[in-house]
C-alpha cells in the first residue's frame, strides 16, 4: 500500500501541475489517513478483546486445576481394593484435567509473550 502511494505521489510530482493534480493529492491523503485511522481502531478493539480472552482462559485454567485436585483427593480417599478401578478412573480423570489445565496455562503464557 505504501509503495503504491509513494509511486502515485512521485508520478503526480513529475506531471505538469494543474488544479486537478493539486486536488487529487489531498483527497488521496485524506482517504489513506481515514483508512489508517479505521485500521487503528480495529487493532485497538482486537487487542482489548484478546486481553479479555487471556483473562477468561486464565480463570478456566484455574478451575481445571481445581477439578484435577478434587479428583486426586477423591481418588486418594479410597483404600478398599474393591474400589481400585474407580480410584484408577479418578486418577486418569485427574490427570486428564490437569493436562487440559496445563495446556490452558501454556496458551496464556505464550499469548503474553507473543
Swiss-Prot record:
Domain of life, per lineage: Bacteria
Protein name according to UniProt: Uncharacterized protein YnzF
Originating species: Bacillus subtilis (strain 168)
Name of the gene this protein is made from: ynzF
Amino acid at each position: 500500500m505504501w509503495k503504491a502511494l509513494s509511486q502515485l505521489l512521485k508520478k503526480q510530482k513529475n506531471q505538469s501541475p494543474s488544479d486537478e493534480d493539486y486536488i487529487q493529492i489531498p483527497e488521496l491523503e485524506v482517504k489513506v489517513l481515514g483508512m489508517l485511522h479505521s485500521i487503528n481502531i480495529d487493532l485497538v478493539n482486537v487487542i482489548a478483546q484478546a486481553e479479555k480472552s487471556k483473562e477468561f482462559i486464565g480463570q478456566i485454567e484455574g478451575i481445571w486445576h481445581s477439578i484435577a485436585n478434587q479428583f486426586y483427593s477423591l481418588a486418594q480417599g479410597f483404600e478398599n481394593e474393591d474400589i481400585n478401578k474407580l480410584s484408577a478412573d479418578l486418577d486418569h480423570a485427574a490427570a486428564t484435567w490437569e493436562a487440559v489445565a496445563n495446556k490452558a496455562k501454556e496458551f496464556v503464557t505464550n499469548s503474553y509473550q507473543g
